[in-house]
Amino acid sequence: MKGDLQRSGPQPFCSEYWYVYILRCADDRSYTGYTQDLNDRIARHARGSVPATKNRRPIKLETYFAFSDQNQALEFEKYLKTGSGRAVMNKRFFKRLDS
């Protein structure tokens, strides 16, 4: 039936998942973080409630990755903040996102 279709995989912004997200800030630099409530976290960045991005607004959500395991999300966030992780991020996901 038409209304019975279900998507497989993670549902966008579902509280059962942990999210690693990448923002582009007004200074054309990136910010990488992780959270379980992506909508709330992005809203907090946009309001200026997050010290790391408060003076770098407006922000734009560039991409996010969903993980069912918190530790995997945290490890991926840490990796993206390393030199090799940033190089992969810049090469594979974006034309240019600096630190």
Where do the protein language model's features map onto the residues?
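GIY-YIG nuclease catalytic motif and its immediate N-terminal context
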Residues: 1-50, 57, 64-82, 86, ...
